[in-house]
Each structure stands twice: as C-alpha cells, then as structure tokens.
UniProtKB/Swiss-Prot annotation:
CDD domains in the record: RPS2
GO molecular function, one term: structural constituent of ribosome
Gene Ontology cellular component terms for the protein in this record: cytosolic small ribosomal subunit
Highest taxon listed in the record's lineage: Bacteria
Keyword match Transmembrane: no
A family per Pfam: Ribosomal_S2
Gene, per the UniProt record: rpsB
Keyword Ribosomal protein: yes
Descriptive protein name: Small ribosomal subunit protein uS2
Entry-linked PANTHER family: 30S RIBOSOMAL PROTEIN S2 PROKARYOTIC AND ORGANELLAR, SMALL RIBOSOMAL SUBUNIT PROTEIN US2M
Organism, as annotated: Shigella flexneri
This protein's UniProt keywords: Ribonucleoprotein, Ribosomal protein
Amino acid sequence: MATVSMRDMLKAGVHFGHQTRYWNPKMKPFIFGARNKVHIINLEKTVPMFNEALAELNKIVSRKGKILFVGTKRAASEAVKDAALSCDQFFVNHRWLGGMLTNWKTVRQSIKRLKDLETQSQDGTFDKLTKKEALMRTRELEKLENSLGGIKDMGGLPDALFVIDADHEHIAIKEANNLGIPVFAIVDTNSDPDGVDFVIPGNDDAIRAVTLYLGAVAATVREGRSQDLASQAEESFVEAE
C-alpha cells in the first residue's frame, strides 16, 4: 500500500508551519518547536497519522466508496483536480458553494442543468440560437462547469472528504460533519483541527508538500479501486462456476 516516509516529507517541506504569531493553540501537540518565528511541525507525529489516513481511505474505496477532494485556494487548485482525475474520483477546486453537501437536492438540479447545456453545446442546439442567447448559455455552461464540473458524475454524496487546508475549507468540513461524512485534512499550525476525523499536521501552502499529499492519496485510491475490481471479478467467477 502507498505510504509516505519522513524523508519524503522533509524534502517537500511538510514540516514548515506558519509564523508563530498566527498559531492555533489546539495544534500544540503536533508542533516540534519554532525556528526564525516559524513553527516547525513534528513529523514524528505526521508520518504515522498520514499513513493511518491512507490506510483508512484505501479501505473506504475498496468498499466502493467515493472520495471528494477539496482544495479551492489557487496554489492547490490545479493539483487537486489532477489528483482526483488520476484516480477517477471527484473534486471541488474553485469555490465551495454553501450547501454543496447539505443541500444536495438543489445541487443535483444544477448538475442536471449543466449536463443539459453540455448536450445542447454538442448537438447543434447552440448553433440554432441567436448570437446573444448562445453566448448567455455558453457563459452559464462555463460557470456551472467551473463550480460543479468535478462532482457532476458523483451521483450522490461522497463517502469521505480529503481536504487541503482545513482553515480555508472550514465550510466544507462543517457540512461533512453535519452529515456524518468522515473528513481527512491537511491541518497547518494556524488551523483548527476540530471537526477533522483524520488530522494530518502539515504545511498546506508549499506546492511540493501539497503535491506529495495528493499523489499519495491518489495512489492509495487507485490501489483500493483495483482491490474492489478484483473482488468483483472473483465474485462473478464464483457465480459462473
């Protein structure tokens, strides 16, 4: 199973927290000390916590679970999308719209509209419209794709959230908490770990660190999915006999 070593984390700068004046005292158990007024995260804690989170994500996916990757700040946005797509999962990487989970019924209607517009743009409907109407629909399509494109094929609520930056994505975490959906999150020294079921103390800004987390999670998910497919194949083989 995919795991991440202390050396990988050091190389990626996972141990660099935020400036000491911005700290959240709830993160004290995970802080090793401070250097040049910057908190240093204790990787002796992070390594096992991250690997435990990976094992749990693997379990969820091997039971056909769906993972929603969430990272809407600019530095993480592209990497979040790439990681989710690389393991056939789902993502929100621009803006978290309030109610995305807790008001799924309404979100589902918006997804239906997005799919209708996609069909119209491909089957020649747009060509039959006035220039102004076609432009308006194209803009609507782009806007919906931007906010819902990563979840349009999710088909229901996810089974877990993997979040980059617990502080930035606190609304998503709160919604998941309300629905009992487990939250796995990268929590930096300035963030509140409350509401996160699997806390991964680490730098949430450095792109190398973010890429490291996402790469490991995507690899774990791919492994979990192949276990699921293998057990499905075994079942159908037994039935065929």
